[in-house]
Every structure is written in C-alpha cells, then in structure tokens.
C-alpha cells in the first residue's frame, strides 16, 4: 500500500518547532532499532528500553520508546521499516541533542521498504527560547541572535582572553544555508571555563586555523552556514585590531551591528587564500546506515579488566562449563549458567549468564574452544561460588557478543595452581586448591542421604605425593560414576594412576580432606610436566615409601548403616534430640490406610523440581496452587501412604511420600488413583494392595519428634524402601554374628514367648540372671539387636567381664569354637541350676526361641 510520511517534520522537531502531539501527530518510519539495557538491573524486563531512528523520508531523528510499549517490539508489531503515527510524544533536549520520547503510537504498516533516502542532519545551533537556529538578516548586515556558551572552548588551548584564531571552514555544505563558501567568515570566539586546559597560556597569541574537513561542525567546530556571536561582547572587527574584552561581557555588554569586512585577513594582514575544494559530504548526509567497522578489535588481557572500562574485548579459551540451573526468588523464576575463561597471559575469570542470555549463549559455548567476548558487565566476584583468583566476574546480557574464532596455540588449555599435600594441612577450611598425586586406594560408591531426603553418591580415595603425605579425596555425585569407575579399574589392574584435581575444596570433617565441588575437574594420567615428574618419582622410590596421612582415618565406604529394630525407636528415644535420627529396619507392612493414599499436587516447576504443594479444585476444571499463586489445567498426584511396619520386636506407623511410595507400590500415584476413582475397579485396586501387604522390606527411616496441636509426637518417615533380598540380608546377619562372637549366648537376638519370659541366655526358673556382659549389650544396640534382658529395658547397667575382652570364642564355659554356651555339653551333663560365672547354681536351662531378623 502507498504510504506517505510527514515531510519536513524531523527538521521541525530538531529546531524546536514541533515538541509534542499538540503541535502535530506526524507519520514516520522506523529505520533503526536497538535494545538498551540498564547495567544496574539487567534481570528486570522493565529496565529494557528500545532506541531507534525515525525518518520522514528526508531526515532522521533519534527516538526512545516508553517501556510500556516494549511488548510491541517483542511481538514483532514494531520492526525495521514499520510506519507509525505518533499520538503521544515529547521532544526532549538531552546534551544539545533532540530525543523523541514516544508514550503512545499507532502502527500503520508493520513492515515496509525504506522510503526515500533519509539522512541524519548536521550540527545546528540552539535557540535559547526554542533550541533552534535563528539567523536574521537586515539590510545586508547580519545580527547574531544566538548566545552560545561553550564550556569546551578552551579544550584545544584557546584562552578566553587570548587573541583568537581566525577560523576558515571550507566545506561542500557551505552553501546549505545560502552562505557562499568563499565569502568572508566571521571570527569565532568560544567563551570557556577550561581555557588553557591543554597547556596554552591564556595570553599567548594564537595561530590561524583553517578547517578543510567535511565533518566541520560535528565535534564542536562551527560550519560556515552557522552564524555565531563572538561571545565576548565586542563588535566584529578585523582580527588584528579586535579589542580584548572579558569573556563575561557577552552576558551584559552592548552588542552593535558591524559591517562585515570586505576581505578576510590573517593575523599577519595577508589575504586568506580560498581553500575550497570539492569535499565528500558530512557523515550520515545523503547516506544510509553507517557501515560496520571491520577493523580487528583491540584485545585486552583479563588481568586488566575493571568495572570502569567502557569497551573491551578479550580472546579466551573456555576451560569449564557448568550445567544449566534454575532458581526461584521473590522476583520470580530464572535460570543461569556459568563458564570459566583463560587467556594467553594466564588470566582467569568466570562468566555468568542469566535468563535471556542463557538462551542466547548456552548452546554456543563449547569447552576447549576459543572466543572473542566483549560488551559484558564486570561485577565483584562472589567468592562463595567462584574459586578463580580474580576479584571480578563477567555478567553477559543480550547486548554482549561472543564470536568464535580459530584455535590459538598461545592460549593454554588448562592452568593449574598446584599445592603439595603437605601444604594442605595448614590451609584454611573451605578454601579451594589444585592438587596432584598418585592414587593409592579407592573405595566403592555408597549412597548418602541429604537433609532434603534425596540421595547423593559418594566415593573416597587416597592421594599421595612427593611431600611424604597423603590425603583423603571425596568424590560426590557424577564424579563417582565416570571418573571414579575409571580410577577403580586402574587400581584393580595394579596401575596406580596420576590424578590431578582442579578446584577441590578443603574440609576438616575427618582431619584435612579434599572434596569435589560443582566446578571441580579430574585429569587422569594427564600429560604435562608435573604429572611426568610425579610418575618418575613413584616408579623410582615412591612405590615403597612411607606416607603420613593428614586425614585422621580413611573413611572408605563412609558411615555404615545404623541397623535397628522397631522396639529400639521407643527404647532408645530416637528422634527426641535436636537432629533427626536416620536408621534402617527390616520390617513387614502389616497394614495400610487406603482412604487417602495420595493428594493433588502442583505440577509447576520450581527450579529443577516441581512445586508439589497441595492444589484445590476451582470447580471449573482448573486447579489453584496457593504457593505459586497460579492456576493449572491439570494437577499431579503424589503418594502420602500411611503404613504400619512390624518386626519381631514391635510395630510402628510410618509415612511414605512420592518416591518411597512408588518403590513400595510399584506404580505411580496417578495410575493407582485412576484405577480406584476413574475406572472404579475396586477388585484390581484390592489386588494391588494385597500384593504389598505382608511383604518384607528394608526401610530407611527418618525419625523426628514433631509437634501436633501442642502435643509432641515421634514421626517416622520412609526415605527409601527396598524389597528384602534374602541373600544379601543373610550375609549381613552372618557378618553381625561374627562381630558378636566376643560375647556369650546373650549376643543372639532373643524373642520372648510370654510376658514372664526372661530373655537372658542363662536364668533359672526361680533365680536371677547372671552378670551381664557390657560388650554384648553395646554390640546388640550397634547392629540393631534387642538387648539381652527384657526388650525395652535399658540403662546404666554396665559391669565389665574379663571374658568379653578375650579371644574369638563362642562358648564361655569350655572355650570351644564348635558351639555356643547355651548348647555346651558341660552344662548339659551337669545338674540343672543357676549358672553364674561358670558354675551351675540351680534351676534349669529355659527354652529359647531365636527370633527372625
């Protein structure tokens, strides 16, 4: 469609003739569009503004879009070539430049070819009243009405009181305002508060300055088309005879119209030669957009970067890249990732990207590649998360640039700051370091439970070096699988590899030890001088050398499982301390409540995990989450099973949530919900419940005392549930029995058959039990066995027995390894009586029943 722009309106805006919609509602075209983002609030959408150039077909004006209209650009309604009508705007004067700020507009055409050949107008003087140029001519004489105070008048050494140079401008645009290029030029004097700034004396004579530049006037130099006052208040006369008047006289002195000198002369009374030659027009005049500067950028070293630099470019190699992470804070949800950089000088710095920058750069960054990076914001480094030796880190935004380039051999692939293991002993806790050594041993992977009821893998190894010291290195998470398994295979084959760890964190949990963090990197059998030197030392003498560990003990597989029986939850008052107790029990599900086995949950992702808070039905098919303050069309279903656990000692109630519930039921809560309520298949639902009931599991429980309605209750939560593997459980029992051989028959788990039954291994029908063995009682509680006395009876009843500290004998009567004391032939052949200290004192041996575990 044919579109007509409002001709000449841009020049009227620049001259101050049109300032708002009350003067005119012009139709203009967008010829350039650029996003401007605040450096203080990069993550807030409201800080983004769009800057553009507006064309009337002839001239260009700079404009700024109100933030409330940003959605028009984001949706593509306004783009390059769009034709718009300004319905609410204002022309502001910002540092001698007119900026059109648009509050409301009407889009006429979303996209159109550039109309005409618009150009950016040259420099124009500003009228005090309206900011425009106001040059009047009266009877052949020109009276200069504009008063101009230029604070930079003395920037190039021109003093306010010194004889001023005659300025002659030879420009191809000299006739733009009907002034001949060869006509006599007015002498220009700039009143300046910075006189003599560049070392020129205030009273020194000045040379004549002749400007033969097409850009005269762009940087403060007046063009021939502009008529300025002298700025000193005296009439315009010959340069050689002009009187010196105070620079402030222009604001109070008399101004007289003087005839122009017939011939311009220099300070030496020589006629000024005409220097006019055909010149190229000023920049942006009768031209399109400025061509991109293809000159190679100046490379800055990382060590020289600081927050006060406006522009910089670094050439770097990416040494590591973190995974994409999501977060949620009071300002809303977000995402971020970071990567580390290294330059040719060994400088290192971390780069962090948020939100839109993540989408722009995440797939572009590849570890090991070389890039040119510029236009980032330098922020103070957060040392809690940044281990690099740099006080700053770079934050990228949508205006930043990352340009891949060819590999540069001068930039190393890695940069280490190795410390001897002996030095680690004196380093501060939670500090980071690089360490290299020989792996002497490694443990299997074990699962550790976190406070948020999630499991994480852990694996430990011993590292030693030429300092004669060794240290425990703990691997967490994914390091246990890839690197950990490779190290395990090498150690099992008899090859003790060289391991370099970059960015390990020093801890003091078990003496001094080194642990991996998210930014850690493993290098197995690396090929650099430190590794080769270490390998040669180990083959020469290190293999048989003695080492002192700076860790108190090698934890190996980590903390063993605390095996308990259900009765011990009450007997030992578990969960009543400040921290919860974590135990493992072997129990059977004897009952399950099926009325409310699940709840409706919020599926909205909160970082890497769903919200999972309870949602309510709005009645219109949508569900509302109070925490997220949002409505969703479909909810999720999560388990909240109430189950009764029972073993040979007691029973207790426990709650199993989503993950543990799926392990118990073998299906998702949503599927089970549909079976019962959607399909209403009660028979199938009951079959599923019956298949779970009376099944033995190994339960990991979290025991914690909580308050309900001002009442203290001990609550058990199922963290993990595994169906009982009889083979592995038998091995566990045999190991427990072997470790209990130091005790007597009381070391076996006993089950009371009646309330009158005394579960001591030796008691008479009428007497009391013999002296108890402290070691056996402690061993029972360590491995989850009931105490030798009645179940639940415990206290400070420790009386040592020399027999408990003896050798690994099974019978404390005859010291034989072939049987236990209860089946000792010596006792069988003697008269029945009470056994005490190896003698029979009457009574008889009671029947015993060894309960299942």
From Swiss-Prot:
Heterotrimer of RPA1, RPA2 and RPA3 (canonical replication protein A complex). GO terms for molecular function: DNA binding; zinc ion binding. Belongs to the replication factor A protein 1 family. It holds the Pfam family REPA_OB_2. Gene3D superfamilies: Nucleic acid-binding proteins. Residues 312-399 bind DNA. This is Replication protein A 70 kDa DNA-binding subunit C. It is found in: Nucleus. The gene is RPA1C. InterPro entries: Euk_RPA1_DBD_C, NA-bd_OB-fold, NA-bd_OB_tRNA, Rep_factor-A_C, Rep_factor-A_N, REPA_OB_2, Rfa1. One of its GO terms (biological process) is DNA recombination. Component of the replication protein A complex (RPA) required for DNA recombination, repair and replication. The activity of RPA is mediated by single-stranded DNA binding and protein interactions. Probably involved in repair of double-strand DNA breaks (DSBs) induced by genotoxic stresses. Keywords: DNA damage, DNA recombination, DNA repair, DNA replication, DNA-binding, Metal-binding, Nucleus, Zinc, Zinc-finger.
């Amino acid at each position: 469609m044919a579109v007509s722009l409002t001709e000449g309106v841009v020049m009227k805006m620049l001259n101050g003739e049109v300032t708002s919609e009350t003067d005119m509602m012009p139709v203009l075209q967008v010829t350039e569009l650029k996003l401007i983002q605040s450096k203080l609030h990069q993550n807030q959408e409201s800080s983004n503004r769009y800057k553009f150039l507006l064309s009337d077909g002839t001239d260009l004006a700079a404009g700024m879009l109100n933030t409330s209209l940003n959605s028009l650009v984001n949706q593509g309604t306004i783009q390059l070539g769009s034709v718009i009508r300004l319905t609410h705007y204002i022309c502001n004067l910002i540092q001698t430049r007119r900026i059109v700020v648009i509050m409301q507009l009407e889009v006429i055409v979303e996209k159109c070819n550039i109309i005409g050949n618009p150009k950016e107008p040259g420099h124009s003087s500003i009228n005090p009243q309206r900011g425009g140029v106001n040059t009047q001519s009266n009877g052949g004489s020109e009276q200069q009405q504009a008063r101009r105070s230029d604070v930079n008048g003395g920037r190039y050494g021109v003093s306010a009181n010194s004889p001023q140079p005659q300025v002659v401008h030879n420009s191809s645009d000299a006739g733009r305002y009907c002034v001949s290029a060869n006509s006599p030029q007015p002498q220009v004097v700039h009143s300046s508060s910075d006189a003599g700034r560049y070392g020129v004396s205030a009273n020194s004579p000045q040379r004549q300055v002749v400007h033969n530049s097409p850009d005269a006037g762009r940087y403060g130099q007046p063009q021939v088309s502009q008529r300025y006052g002298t700025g000193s208040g005296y009439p315009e006369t010959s340069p050689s005879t002009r009187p010196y008047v105070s620079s402030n006289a222009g604001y109070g002195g008399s101004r007289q119209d003087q005839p122009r000198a017939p011939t311009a002369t220099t300070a030496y009374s020589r006629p000024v030669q005409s220097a006019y030659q055909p010149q190229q027009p000023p920049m942006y005049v009768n031209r399109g957009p400025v061509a991109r500067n293809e000159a190679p950028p100046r490379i800055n070293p990382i060590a020289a970067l600081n927050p006060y630099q406006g522009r910089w470019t670094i050439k770097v190699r990416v040494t590591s890249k973190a995974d994409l992470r999501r977060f949620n804070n009071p300002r809303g949800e977000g995402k971020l990732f970071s990567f580390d950089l290294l330059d040719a000088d060994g400088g290192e710095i971390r780069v962090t990207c948020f939100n839109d920058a993540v989408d722009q750069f995440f797939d572009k960054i590849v570890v090991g590649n070389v890039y040119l990076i510029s236009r980032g914001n330098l922020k103070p480094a957060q040392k809690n998360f940044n281990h690099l030796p740099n006080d700053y880190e770079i934050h990228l935004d949508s205006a930043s640039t990352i340009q891949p380039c060819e590999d540069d051999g001068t930039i190393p692939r890695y940069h280490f700051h190795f410390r001897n293991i002996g030095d680690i002993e004196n380093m501060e806790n939670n500090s980071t370091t690089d360490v290299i050594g020989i792996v002497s041993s490694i443990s299997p992977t074990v699962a550790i439970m976190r406070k948020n009821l999630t499991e994480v893998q852990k694996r430990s190894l011993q590292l030693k070096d030429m300092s004669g010291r060794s240290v425990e290195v703990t691997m967490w998470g994914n390091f246990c699988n890839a690197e950990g398994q490779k190290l395990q295979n090498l150690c099992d084959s008899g090859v003790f590899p060289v391991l370099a760890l970059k960015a390990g964190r020093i801890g003091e949990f078990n003496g001094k030890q080194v642990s991996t963090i998210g930014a850690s990197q493993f290098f197995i059998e690396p090929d650099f001088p430190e590794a080769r030197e270490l390998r040669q030392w180990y083959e020469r003498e290190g293999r048989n050398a003695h080492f002192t560990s700076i860790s108190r003990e090698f934890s190996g597989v980590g903390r063993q499982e605390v095996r308990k029986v259900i009765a011990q939850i009450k007997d030992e008052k578990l969960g009543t301390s400040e921290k919860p107790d974590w135990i493992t029990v072997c129990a059977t599900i004897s009952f399950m409540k099926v009325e409310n086995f699940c709840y409706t949950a919020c599926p909205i992702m909160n970082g890497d995990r769903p919200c999972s808070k309870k949602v309510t039905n709005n009645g219109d098919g949508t569900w509302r989450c109070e925490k997220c303050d949002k409505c969703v069309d479909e909810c999720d279903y999560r388990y909240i099973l109430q189950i009764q656990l029972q073993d040979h000692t007691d029973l207790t109630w426990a709650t199993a949530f989503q993950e543990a519930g799926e392990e118990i039921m073998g299906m998702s809560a949503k599927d089970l919900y549909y079976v019962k309520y959607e399909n209403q298949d009660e028979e199938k639902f009951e079959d599923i419940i019956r298949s779970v009931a009376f099944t033995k599991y190994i339960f990991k429980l979290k025991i914690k005392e909580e308050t309900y309605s001002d009442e203290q209750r001990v609550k058990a939560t199922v963290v993990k549930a595994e169906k009982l593997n009889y083979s592995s459980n038998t091995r566990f029992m045999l190991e427990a029995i072997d470790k209990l051989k130091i005790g007597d028959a009381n070391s076996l788990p006993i089950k009371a058959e009646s309330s009158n039954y005394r579960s001591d291994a030796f008691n008479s029908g009428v007497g009391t039990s013999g002296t108890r063995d402290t070691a056996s009682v402690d061993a029972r509680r360590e491995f989850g066995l009931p105490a030798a006395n009645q179940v639940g009876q415990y206290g400070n009843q420790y009386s040592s027995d020399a027999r408990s500290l003896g050798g690994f004998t099974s019978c404390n009567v005859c010291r034989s390894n072939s049987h236990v004391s209860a089946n000792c032939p010596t006792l069988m052949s003697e008269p029945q009586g009470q056994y005490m200290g190896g003698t029979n004192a009457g009574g008889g041996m009671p029947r015993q029943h060894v309960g299942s575990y």
